[in-house]
């Protein structure tokens, strides 16, 4: 009994507990709001989950739409379903979502989530979905283009739910309905648009219920229709064969595009890119290589969004002149003769025709010429009016009128030229035959030449003693006469080989053409060898050479003297053993390879084309003994011992070198072993060249040298150069020359110029500088030793002054203490030295170092050359500044390169 009661009580308790659980079970929808508001076009997600203790007791969980239909699960076959449900993971949580990817206005309503709990209790929860429409720009282009002087509405049509309020702003200010503006629901109307209305307008839409606001900036650009600027004239001319361009210019906004039309054919030239074309952007009509058929009316149309404008131009073609005929003519010269040159020219417009002679740059003028009344220029038009005939009329034609003439036709299209020839015929003339006398001799061929000028060419015949030399003579008979003919006109040469004296005489050359005859005479004379030489003088004689001067001969035999000859032998020889030497006229007459101290016999003769004349003017001379060579002749301006003017100075083109050249002198019986070249810097005093106190350069050249390169010279300096030849006997008299080098601004004084690989030599001034520098360095070392050991000398004095100054200046002492570790001065003592503390300033110490001047004179073998005058001498000293440690020399030569 007690057990039954306990069971009943337990059952009652469990029933009460189950009822309490069932009563608290429910569904929860997230977002947790009974009303959901979403804009149309947005996505939406509603989540339904059971709010129970045991979710396994939930079944039949689903969503229904406002129509009561169950919302299906997502169908994989549909790419984009409008509305569907899906489980959220994990599956055991039983969370069912309602998804709407894109809300529509028809989706407004109540959506219900329901479920069955414990198979007995129905659970449900609802949410109301309300859609709103955001501000949408239905017709509000961001760029709009009104036309000037017209009424234009700036469009701005807006849709929204709830409806939006629209107003306008410009430059931050509200635009209200006024004189020229009318604010409407779908736009802003502007009355009588002007260019000042350009700018940015803002269309503002407001929904007060939702607090939404949207702005749409609209750029307004006022367009103006095209207007021709007047750059295109009504008529234009194009020149045949050239490129033609016509430009059509119009103003407007936006920039207009252009179209060119040929009016007579209505052809759009912008679509034809061949020879005739048009540029739609630049408005240019282009015609390449204009032809006559391009003449027409052309229309240009400028067009933009605001309208069009048209202009028409008439293009005429200028046809270049052409010369069709300009014939060559022939006219005989004479008092009553007349020459007419006709030139036929065409072109549009008809060209003007004139002439000129090619040998004269000036053109003839129309009518009678002011400087030559024989010449007239005239012209007429052809009967059809398409040709201009120009005429050049020359009366009383002269031979000088012969030549080329130029016809010149000119019009707007340009100028064209053509040459024609006027041939003036005349009888023969021997004006250009210079031969009047010819010399010949036995068995020697001589040419007699005639040149006959005539038009037409003349035929030439030869006569001697009144007979025609070649009439009736041919072949072997003609050759036996000694005459040969080359050419019969207009140039003819008669070759004569005289074999007897009867062939000398007067020959006549006769030229004949249809206008007349001319005769020219040439005298053939007999030439002989020259007569004896009038006089021969011995000019220079050395041990091995002799130089002659010739005078004569008295009679050259009819031909100029070509050579002089000498026949010479030793006194002990006969003339059959004599030697000969021949020189051309006006050459150096030097006989070489003679023996020293030898007696020679000489005789002389002259030679022309015929041969040598008789030997004459016999002389006897004895060559001197062997001696030193002759003076070398320098190839340049020789030094004069008396004048010494600046014009006698040879200028080197280089600042530091000079190429010296000379002729090989006579060795006077002994071969030249070597040459000596010496160069010394000099300066001119009054009329003399004096040596400067600088070292000279000497060079010895072995062998037969004839050139030498003087190097290491100073710029802008005069040098006296000597060349001596030496043989076993001794030295020759020196050949002398003065050379001046050019200036070289890039070279520093005292520095040797090193150019072309040459090494400079150190001058005496440079040596002085090096010696002074070495002395200064030695003094500095000695003073430093004195400072370190005995604390005396210049360095010690300077150090003591620094230290004593540090005592008197506290700030300087502090600074010195900071740096004392960096610059230890063991010789810097605080001990005062009265001598060092003297207030007097230190004076510069000057050390006089004499410099020995080189006074080696150039010698000519006898007396020394004057050196330097006393007034030119300078004292040389070196100044040493103990404060600045700088040395300098007080010597500066007047013309010294250092």
Curated annotation (Swiss-Prot):
Upper classification of the organism: Eukaryota, Metazoa, Ecdysozoa, Arthropoda, Hexapoda
Domain Ig-like C2-type: 31-124, 134-219, 226-316, 321-423, 428-525
Residue pairs linked by disulfide bridges in the UniProt entry: 48-113, 156-203, 248-300, 343-407, 450-509
Membrane in keyword set: yes
Transmembrane segments: 765-782
Protein's recorded name: Fasciclin-2
Gene giving rise to this polypeptide: FAS2
Keyword terms: Cell adhesion, Developmental protein, Differentiation, Disulfide bond, Glycoprotein, Immunoglobulin domain, Membrane, Neurogenesis, Repeat, Signal, Transmembrane, Transmembrane helix
Described purpose of this protein according to its UniProt entry: Neuronal recognition molecule. Involved in a pathway recognition for axons during the development of nerve fascicles.
Residue intervals of the Fibronectin type-III domain: 532-626, 644-745
Signal peptide: 1-22
């Amino acid at each position: 009994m007690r057990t039954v009661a306990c069971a009943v009580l337990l059952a009652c308790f469990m029933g009460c507990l189950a009822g309490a659980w069932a009563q608290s079970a429910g569904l929860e929808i997230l977002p947790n709001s009974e009303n959901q508001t979403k804009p149309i076009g947005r996505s939406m997600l509603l989540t339904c989950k059971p709010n129970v203790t045991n979710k396994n007791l939930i079944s039949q969980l689903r969503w229904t739409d406002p129509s009561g239909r169950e919302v299906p699960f997502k169908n994989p076959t549909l790419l984009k379903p409008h509305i569907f449900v899906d489980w959220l993971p994990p599956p055991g949580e039983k969370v069912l979502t309602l998804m709407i990817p894109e809300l529509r206005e028809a989706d407004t309503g109540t959506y219900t989530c329901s479920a069955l709990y414990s198979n007995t209790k129905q659970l449900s929860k609802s949410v109301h979905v309300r859609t709103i429409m955001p501000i949408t720009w239905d017709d509000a282009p961001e760029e709009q283009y009104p036309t000037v002087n017209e009424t234009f509405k700036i469009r701005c049509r807006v849709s929204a739910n709830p409806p939006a309020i629209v107003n306008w702003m410009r430059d931050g200010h509200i635009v209200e309905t006024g004189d020229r503006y009318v604010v409407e629901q779908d736009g802003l109307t502007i009355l009588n648009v002007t260019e000042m209305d350009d700018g940015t307008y803002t269309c503002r839409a407001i929904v007060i219920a939702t607090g939404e606001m949207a702005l749409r900036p609209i750029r307004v650009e006022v367009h103006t229709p095209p207007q021709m600027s007047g750059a295109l004239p009504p008529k234009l001319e194009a020149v045949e064969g050239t490129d033609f361009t016509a430009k059509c210019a119009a103003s407007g906004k936006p920039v207009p595009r252009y179209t060119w039309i040929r009016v007579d054919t209505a052809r759009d030239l912008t679509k034809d890119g061949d020879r005739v074309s048009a540029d739609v952007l630049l408005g240019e009509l282009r015609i390449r290589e204009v032809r006559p058929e391009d003449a027409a009316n052309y229309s240009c149309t400028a067009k933009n969004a605001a309208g069009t404008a048209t202009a028409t131009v008439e293009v005429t073609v200028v046809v270049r002149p052409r010369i069709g005929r300009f014939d060559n003519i022939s006219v005989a010269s004479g008092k009553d003769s007349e020459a007419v040159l006709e030139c036929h020219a065409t072109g549009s417009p008809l060209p003007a025709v004139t002439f000129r002679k090619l040998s004269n740059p000036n053109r003839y003028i129309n009518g009678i010429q002011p400087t030559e009344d024989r010449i007239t220029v005239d012209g007429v038009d052809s009967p059809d009016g398409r040709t201009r005939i120009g005429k050049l009329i020359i009366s009383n034609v002269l031979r000088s009128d012969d030549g080329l003439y130029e016809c010149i036709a000119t019009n707007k299209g340009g100028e064209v030229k053509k040459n024609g020839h006027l041939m003036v015929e005349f009888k023969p003339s021997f004006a250009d035959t210079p031969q009047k006398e010819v010399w010949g001799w036995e068995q020697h061929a001589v040419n007699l030449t005639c040149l006959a000028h005539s038009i037409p060419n003349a035929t030439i015949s030869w006569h001697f003693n009144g007979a025609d030399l070649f009439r009736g003579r041919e072949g072997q008979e003609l050759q036996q006469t000694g005459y040969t003919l080359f050419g019969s006109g207009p140039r003819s040469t008669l070759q004569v080989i005289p074999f007897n004296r009867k062939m000398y005489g007067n020959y006549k050359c006769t030229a004949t053409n249809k206008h007349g005859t001319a005769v020219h005479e040439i005298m053939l004379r007999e030439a002989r060898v020259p007569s004896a030489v009038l006089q021969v003088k011995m000019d220079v004689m050395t041990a091995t050479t002799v130089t002659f001067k010739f005078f004569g001969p008295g009679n050259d035999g009819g031909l100029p003297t070509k050579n002089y000859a000498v026949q010479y032998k030793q006194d002990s020889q006969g003339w059959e053993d004599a030697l000969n030497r021949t020189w051309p006229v006006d050459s150096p007459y030097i006989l070489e390879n003679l023996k020293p101290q030898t007696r020679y016999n000489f005789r002389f003769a002259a030679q022309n084309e015929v041969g040598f004349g008789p030997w004459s003017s016999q002389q006897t001379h004895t060559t001197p003994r062997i001696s030193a060579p002759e003076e070398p002749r320098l190839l340049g301006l020789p030094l004069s011992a008396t004048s010494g003017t600046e014009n006698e100075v040879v200028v080197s083109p280089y600042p530091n070198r000079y190429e010296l050249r000379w002729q090989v002198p006579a060795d006077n019986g002994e071969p030249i072993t070597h040459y000596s070249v010496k160069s010394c810097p000099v300066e001119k005093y009054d009329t003399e060249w004096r040596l400067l106190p600088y070292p000279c350069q000497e060079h010895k050249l072995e062998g037969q040298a004839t050139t030498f390169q003087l190097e290491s010279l100073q710029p802008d300096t005069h040098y006296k150069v000597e060349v001596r030849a030496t043989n076993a006997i001794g030295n020759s008299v020196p050949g002398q020359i003065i050379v001046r080098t050019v200036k070289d601004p890039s070279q520093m004084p005292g520095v040797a110029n090193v150019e072309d690989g040459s090494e400079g030599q150190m001058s005496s001034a440079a040596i002085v500088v090096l010696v002074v520098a070495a002395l200064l360095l030695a003094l500095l070392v000695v003073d430093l030793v004195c400072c370190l050991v005995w604390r005396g000398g210049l360095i010690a004095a300077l150090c003591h002054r620094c230290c004593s100054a540090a005592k008197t200046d506290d700030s300087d002492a502090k600074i010195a203490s900071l740096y004392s570790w960096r610059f230890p001065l063991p010789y810097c003592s605080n001990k005062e030295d009265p001598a060092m503390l003297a207030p007097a300033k230190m004076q510069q110490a000057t050390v006089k170092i004499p410099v020995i001047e080189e006074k080696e004179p150039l010698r000519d073998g006898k007396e020394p050359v004057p050196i330097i005058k006393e007034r030119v001498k300078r004292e040389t000293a070196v100044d040493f500044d103990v404060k600045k440690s700088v040395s300098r020399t007080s010597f500066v030569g007047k013309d010294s390169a250092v």
